[in-house]
UniProtKB/Swiss-Prot annotation:
Belongs to the universal ribosomal protein uL29 family. It comes from the Bacteria. Disulfide bonds: none annotated. GO terms for cellular component: cytosolic large ribosomal subunit. GO terms for biological process: translation. The lineage of its organism: Bacteria, Bacillati, Actinomycetota, Actinomycetes, Kitasatosporales. This is Large ribosomal subunit protein uL29. Keywords: Ribonucleoprotein, Ribosomal protein. It comes from Streptomyces griseus subsp. griseus (strain JCM 4626 / CBS 651.72 / NBRC 13350 / KCC S-0626 / ISP 5235).
């Protein structure tokens, strides 16, 4: 995933693609945490952005589950 995937980009994805993005983000978060624990992590801000991406994906999945439509502001 890129550094901070936008919610509007995620809304364009299907359910299966969204699950794949979630799986990739969780795997990346695991690897980043491992690097941080061993002192090899250079970009600590990446941890925060990956966690936020995961939260965006979960939020979007919940919105779809509840049938909530979001209105994009201009």
């Amino acid at each position: 995933m890129s550094a901070g995937t936008k919610a509007s980009e995620l809304r364009e994805l299907g359910d299966e693609e969204l699950l794949n993005k979630l799986r990739e983000a969780k795997e990346e978060l695991f690897n980043l945490r491992f690097q941080a624990a061993t002192g090899q992590l250079e970009n600590h801000g990446r941890l925060k952005s990956v966690r936020k991406d995961i939260a965006r994906i979960y939020t979007l999945m919940r919105e779809r589950e509840l049938g909530i439509e979001t209105v994009e502001s201009a």
